[in-house]
């Protein structure tokens, strides 16, 4: 391991040098150069670990859990994804495509945390402090109580933390940070792992929360070693299509809250605005009397959400028809098509199938199977379903429609937005839900027979606005 040399920093301007001087070359002040605290290289003695460690009972640790504090930013969608808010000592990794809005949402959150009384330190390795300040001015945050810094050397950053003692640290980004104890270029696997370890260790040792921005690869995976995701407490992913104004903040991992929780934001001129009722917004531009359009009642984390599934089935002249999907699992689409063909006798061998989820959101739960089958069947047979109907249910390979979780929450959200009918699997609770008609279907064949009655008819369709 490389030998660590002493470093000195100026308490007035922060200039770092490798030797002491009476006068700072940066600001000109006298007697402001002091030795900086060096980073620990970890255990070096062979004798460490030979003696038996102290036993700690879990019951003795329980009272200390009361010291775990939550801080709310006031941005409800951001706090929702974190759980109850920002946890002290938490290490958080935020990833997303370039230009999706990672720095914007963090700068907005930092400003709100600062206004709430937290001491916030924003370190940018990609922009100068003046550039961050200019962006803050554009977002209307020029007077926010945030301390800004532009640095990439890990030792200098941690020394600054020791001096400032912040409550919240934001590192933008972890791929630009380099440690002088690691003999490799910034952004390499070893550098990212070392920087993440030191920053996470700092959070656990001092009680400060650390948020690190991470780059992604071309296929959307977090760049760098997978071990970083295991180190941190929370992994957030910022997703969305550049052509859409919506941005989805999703919790991929969270030790302090539900996984797959989402926060919905809308890109505006003054930054990212939170969307308090995403279901209503996702359905605001839904057309009426259109084959292939259905509404799915889903659950993302703890939040019920309604989204529109759009399908298009066209004759194909290709030897292998296209199967294109946006926002859903392509393998699961192939399974639904196979079940429709095998169990219901609907052939797609000579047809291209396109599936899209409106608004740019991504759905992962199997409960969307029935909505996908309904959209494809509607597009294939040119059938228009009632616009006031929602669909949800998991489809098995036998064609059976299975029950899904949190049915009451799905129905409540649908009823709130004016939907009067739901088609799903048979429920254990036979008591009907007030205000909404539940139509149960045992298998996909019964569902297809049930929906055939709408062919060539537009009776029962709403006014296009649920």
Segments from the language model and where they lie:
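Peripheral, non-AAA+ core regions of ATP-driven protein-machinery
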Residues: 2-5, 9-12, 16-80, 87-107, ...
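Conserved Walker A/P-loop ATP-binding site and its immediately adjacent core
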Residues: 125-131
């Amino acid at each position: 391991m490389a030998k660590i040399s002493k470093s000195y920093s100026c308490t007035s301007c922060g200039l770092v040098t490798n030797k002491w001087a009476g006068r700072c070359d940066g600001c000109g002040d006298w007697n402001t150069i002091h030795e900086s605290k060096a980073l620990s290289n970890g255990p070096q003695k062979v004798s460490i670990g030979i003696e038996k460690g102290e036993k700690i009972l879990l019951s003795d640790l329980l009272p200390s859990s009361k010291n775990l504090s939550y801080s709310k930013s006031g941005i409800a969608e951001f706090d929702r994804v974190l759980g109850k808010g920002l946890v002290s000592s938490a290490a958080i990794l935020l990833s997303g495509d370039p230009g999706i809005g990672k720095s914007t949402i963090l700068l907005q959150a930092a400003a709100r945390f600062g206004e709430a009384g937290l001491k916030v330190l924003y370190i940018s390795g990609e922009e100068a402090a003046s550039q961050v300040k200019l962006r803050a001015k554009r977002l209307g945050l020029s007077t926010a109580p945030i301390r800004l810094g532009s640095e990439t050397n890990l030792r200098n950053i941690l020394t600054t933390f020791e001096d400032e003692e912040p409550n919240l640290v934001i590192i933008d980004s972890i791929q630009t940070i380099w440690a002088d104890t690691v003999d490799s270029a910034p952004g390499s696997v070893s550098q990212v792992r070392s920087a993440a370890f030191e920053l996470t260790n700092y959070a656990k040792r001092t009680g400060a929360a650390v948020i690190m921005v991470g780059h992604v690869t071309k296929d959307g995976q977090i760049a760098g070693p997978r071990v970083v995701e295991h180190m941190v407490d929370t992994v957030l992913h910022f997703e969305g299509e550049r052509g859409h104004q919506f941005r989805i903040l999703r919790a991929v991992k969270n030790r302090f809250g539900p996984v797959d929780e989402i926060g919905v934001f809308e890109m505006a001129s003054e930054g990212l605005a939170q969307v308090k009722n995403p279901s209503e917004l996702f359905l605001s531009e839904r057309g009426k009397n259109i084959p292939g359009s259905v509404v799915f009642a889903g659950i993302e984390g703890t939040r019920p959400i309604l989204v529109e599934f759009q399908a298009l089935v066209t004759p194909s002249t290709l030897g292998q028809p296209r199967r294109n999907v946006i926002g859903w699992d392509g393998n699961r689409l192939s399974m639904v098509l196979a079940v429709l063909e095998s169990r219901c006798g609907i052939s797609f061998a000579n047809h291209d199938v396109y599936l899209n989820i409106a608004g740019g959101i991504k759905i992962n739960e199997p409960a969307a199977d029935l909505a996908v089958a309904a959209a494809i069947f509607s597009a294939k047979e040119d059938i228009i379903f009632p616009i006031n109907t929602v669909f949800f249910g998991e489809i098995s390979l036998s064609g059976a429609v299975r029950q899904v979780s949190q049915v009451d929450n799905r129905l409540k959200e649908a009823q709130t937005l004016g939907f009067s009918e739901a088609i799903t699997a048979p429920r254990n609770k036979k008591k009907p839900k007030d205000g909404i008609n539940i139509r149960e279907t045992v298998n996909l064949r019964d569902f297809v027979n049930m929906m055939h009655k709408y062919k060539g008819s537009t009776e029962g369709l709403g006014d296009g606005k649920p």
